[in-house]
Each structure stands twice: as structure tokens, then as C-alpha cells.
Amino acid sequence: YKMSKTQKILQKLLSANGAKWSKSEFFKDTQIVEDFGDTARETDAILNSSAILHCSHWGRLSFTGKDHQDFLQRMSTNDIESLENGRGIESVFTEAKGRVIDLATLYHKAETTLCIVSPDSSKELSDWLSKYTFSEEMTITNKEAQNEMIEIWGPKTKHVIYSAFNIDI
């Protein structure tokens, strides 16, 4: 397993803040943060400041094309077509008999919907969805190798995002 440049930068940043890494027993070829060594400090950061959660082991599928929202509407349990630009929604992908294939969070921006799915399930979900793609003009792309993912929690999240990325949310 070879880490990308972005993974190395993220790992260095998190390690500098006390992250203890371990190889995941559940997610292949994945290093995850076990903890930062002080549960009380971690809890305090989430409640009073901000905390970064490394989530790169979660799956990320990008849906593009003029038919992708209609397709997702038919294949999942929530109202994807009413999802506004810049917003997100939780949904479930199920088989015809109701068996859950995966839980997902979908974010819509412009002509793309990003689908966050369970770790190690991107390929299975993409393959399953492809079986039901016939004449739809759309593309499903696995984005896991192209980017990293973090969550930022806590009341000072806006400040952290602005300071780190110069984005005002």
C-alpha cells in the first residue's frame, strides 16, 4: 500500500496533533486514527472547540450526467430529485425485496452528486447500480483514490474551515 501525497500531508498533520495510527482490521490497506491519546481532551475539543475526524476509508462515488438524479431517485429510498444545490441528504440503497445494500449520504453540487458510502463498499455498490443502468446518460466514478476525506466537528468548525481553506460557510 502506497500513500498519496495528500495522505502523507494529512497523516503528518494529524500525527503532529497526537494521532495514534493503526492498520484497520476491517478496511483493507487502510491506516486509521485509533485515538489522540487523551479521551477527555478529545471530548472537550468536540464540545468546546473543534475536532478533525479522518474519514478517508469511507467510500466516495461521484454521479454525473443528465440522468443521474433521476436514476438515484429510483434506486434509493429518499427524495434525491428535490435535493438542492449545495445540500445533502441521507438515503438507503435496497434490493427489490428491501434488503439493505448500503446506507449513504448524498451531496448535490451543480451537475454532480457525491455519494458517501460505507468503507469498502464502493465497488459492490457501483457494480450493483451498474446492473440497473440501461439507457441513462450518467457516469459513476469511484473518487477514493483521488482525494482524502475529513469531518470537522464542534462549535468552532466554521473558524477552522475558514482558517485552513479560506472558505466561509
Briefly describe each language-model feature range.
Residues 2-169:
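Basic, glycine/lysine-rich polyanion-binding surfaces/domains
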